[in-house]
């Protein structure tokens, strides 16, 4: 009878659990259940069953224990700067001791928020976007928000589908690296009062919050570096028809013009995105460049994976890097030093993009009225490694 009663009580509330042991009367005095209330014992056949109602640790419990206000506890948990280091350490120590977990559901009922942020990127496996996601997640977590990441696979239709799926989960805000060439989807989101932030890629005609690198400067910086190390026939393995690909191509052309070098269409290789990974596309592009006469002596690649494929193809064909062809990528990915030839690259500051995106997103969510759209353009940085370290022995012209 006792077991049936306990089972019924447990079924009535998710906050009621049964201690795992059965206790005899001689053992009752030593029983302790942390964060719980002991309900009167039920006796059956000389055995005692203890029904325990779990009590969720609340912020006000921590505040009472430490002699602080609930507001102070909340600020610590949201990583608010207006808290002393001593108070922060006391609160975090107590939170860890009690294994306190914020009740997101209850919080959502009060605030009307889900505390979820969506991120849509073209390629989850690309290290550039992976680092942005990691940076963004870390920054959001400090303020009690959590990140859901999705991939569009460089497909505008899939991007719209993924965005709609995320919006169906009532996310508080979206952060998007779009592969679209039209703005209709974003105009619709604005009409629906759905806040969003664009990263890496911007769309013409759209006034929106944006964080990214100066892509025209990326193209100029990479191409000028190749020219500075003696290259006179500089090719470009270009990227997709997005703002990043278009502007890096413009920077490439500008650098050639500034150095009075001729631009040749045959030296610009556009590889179909398809389902082929970037390294394979880079290898195929380099195969085409090696068949040209005169052959390029320098190659600026849209990103590091393309450059990695290009280097491998050139080396396999017996071409020396950098003596015969100097190659530079973009992204400054962490594994560049472990390549067959360490790759020179342009740092796009992916970690900073994630941090800035989080800052702007949180600013939107915490503002009483929608703030004016903010644009953050980061300055690219040249990182020189072996793939472009050539002696300047070539004659000008």
What are these regions, as identified by a protein language model?
Residues 65, 70-75, 109-125, 225, ...:
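Short beta-strand segments enriched in small/hydrophobic residues
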Residues 138-184:
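Central regulatory/effector-binding core of bacterial HTH transcription factors
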Residues 106, 160-163, 186, 223, ...:
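Short hydrophobic/charged patches on amphipathic alpha-helices used for structural packing
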Residues 5-8, 16-54, 97, 135-143, ...:
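Bacterial carbohydrate/catabolite-sensing allosteric modules
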Residues 50-58, 96-134, 142-145, 153-155, ...:
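N-terminal helix-turn-helix/winged-helix DNA-binding helices
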Residues 123-126, 153-154, 180, 239-243, ...:
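Short histidine/acidic/glycine/proline-rich micro-motifs that form metal-
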Residues 14-20, 27-115, 392:
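N-terminal helix-turn-helix DNA-binding module of bacterial transcription factors
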């Amino acid at each position: 009878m006792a077991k049936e009663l306990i089972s019924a009580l447990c079924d009535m509330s998710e906050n009621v659990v049964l201690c795992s042991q059965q206790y005899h009367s001689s053992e009752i005095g030593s029983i302790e259940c942390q964060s719980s209330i002991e309900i009167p014992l039920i006796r059956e056949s000389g055995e005692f069953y203890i029904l325990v109602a779990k009590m969720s640790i609340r912020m006000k419990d921590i505040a009472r224990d430490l002699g602080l206000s609930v507001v102070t506890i909340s600020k610590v948990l949201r990583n608010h700067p207006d808290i002393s280091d001593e108070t922060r350490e006391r609160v975090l120590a107590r939170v860890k001791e009690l294994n306190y977990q914020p009740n997101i559901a209850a919080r959502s009922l009060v605030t009307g928020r889900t505390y979820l942020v969506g991120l849509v990127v073209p390629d989850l496996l690309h290290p550039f976007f992976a680092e942005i996601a990691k940076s963004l997640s870390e920054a959001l977590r400090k303020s009690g928000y959590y990140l859901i990441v999705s991939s569009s696979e460089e497909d505008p239709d899939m991007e719209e589908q993924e965005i709609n799926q995320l919006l169906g989960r009532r996310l508080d805000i979206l952060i998007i690296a779009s592969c679209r060439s039209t703005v209709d989807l974003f105009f619709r989101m604005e009409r629906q009062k759905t806040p969003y932030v664009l990263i890496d890629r911007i769309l013409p005609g759209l006034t929106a919050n944006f964080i990214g690198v100066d892509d025209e400067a990326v193209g100029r910086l990479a191409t000028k570096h190749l020219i500075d190390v003696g290259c006179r026939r500089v090719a470009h393995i270009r990227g997709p028809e997005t703002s990043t690909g278009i502007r890096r191509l413009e920077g490439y052309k500008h650098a050639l013009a500034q150095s009075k070098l001729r631009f040749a269409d045959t030296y610009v290789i556009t590889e179909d995105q398809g389902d082929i990974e970037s390294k394979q596309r880079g290898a195929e592009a380099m195969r085409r460049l090696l068949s040209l006469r005169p052959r390029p002596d320098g190659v600026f690649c849209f990103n590091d994976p393309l450059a990695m494929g290009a280097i491998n193809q050139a080396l396999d064909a017996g071409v020396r890097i950098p003596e015969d062809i100097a190659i530079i990528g973009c992204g400054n990915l962490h594994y560049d030093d472990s390549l067959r030839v360490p790759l020179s690259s342009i740092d796009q500051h992916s970690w900073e993009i994630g941090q800035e995106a989080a800052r702007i997103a949180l600013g939107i969510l915490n503002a009483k009225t929608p703030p004016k759209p903010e644009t953050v353009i980061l300055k690219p940085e040249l990182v020189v490694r072996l793939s472009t370290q050539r002696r300047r022995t070539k004659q000008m012209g």
